[in-house]
UniProtKB/Swiss-Prot annotation:
It comes from the Bacteria. Its main location: cytoplasm. An aminoacyl-tRNA editing enzyme that deacylates mischarged D-aminoacyl-tRNAs. Also deacylates mischarged glycyl-tRNA(Ala), protecting cells against glycine mischarging by AlaRS. Acts via tRNA-based rather than protein-based catalysis; rejects L-amino acids rather than detecting D-amino acids in the active site. By recycling D-aminoacyl-tRNA to D-amino acids and free tRNA molecules, this enzyme counteracts the toxicity associated with the formation of D-aminoacyl-tRNA entities in vivo and helps enforce protein L-homochirality. Disulfide bonds: none annotated. Its EC number is 3.1.1.96. Homodimer. It catalyses: glycyl-tRNA(Ala) + H2O = tRNA(Ala) + glycine + H(+); a D-aminoacyl-tRNA + H2O = a tRNA + a D-alpha-amino acid + H(+). GO terms for cellular component: cytoplasm. This is D-aminoacyl-tRNA deacylase. It is found in: Cytoplasm. SUPFAM superfamilies: DTD-like. A Gly-cisPro motif from one monomer fits into the active site of the other monomer to allow specific chiral rejection of L-amino acids.
């Protein structure tokens, strides 16, 4: 399971002209689900995403996680993160989970975030989405479990 996380000052996702999720300061989480992923991996990734210390403390040091910084989370499904790009000029998606399994694990991940009393907004699984963000830093990390 892969999370591309970006520290943002604001982010939103729009589907068919409707804003489905919007946050102020916090994390934009682009989430990719691979074939061998399961609930245990989703739990570990959620723990890492919410616990990752990439927000500045009073001394300007990256020492706070999103909860400590008072931020929110916007989770957007992105199957392209599971692409195999090692050969050729076209990505292969053979590493990605089936759509049904990916959606179930995406929903599970979102619910785990919410269970941690985290303000969690979402896109719409498998939809054509427009994601807007202001990357703060820029600060972007690839987390994989």
């Amino acid at each position: 399971m892969i999370a591309l996380i970006q520290r943002v000052t604001r982010a939103s996702v729009t589907v068919e002209g409707e804003v489905t999720g919007e946050i102020g300061a916090g994390l934009l989480v682009l989430l990719g689900v691979e074939k061998d992923d399961d609930e245990q991996k989703a739990n570990r990734l959620c723990e890492r995403v919410l616990g990752y210390r990439i927000f500045s403390d009073v001394e300007g040091k990256m020492n706070l996680n999103v909860q400590q910084a008072g931020g929110s989370v916007l989770v957007v499904s992105q199957f392209t993160l599971a692409a195999d790009t090692e050969r050729g000029m076209r990505p292969s998606f053979s590493k990605g989970a089936s759509p049904d399994r990916a959606e179930a694990l995406y929903d599970y991940f979102v619910e785990r975030c919410r269970q941690q009393e985290m303000n969690t907004q979402t896109g719409r699984f498998a939809a054509d989405m427009q994601v807007s963000l202001v990357n703060d830093g820029p600060v972007t990390f690839w987390l994989q479990v």
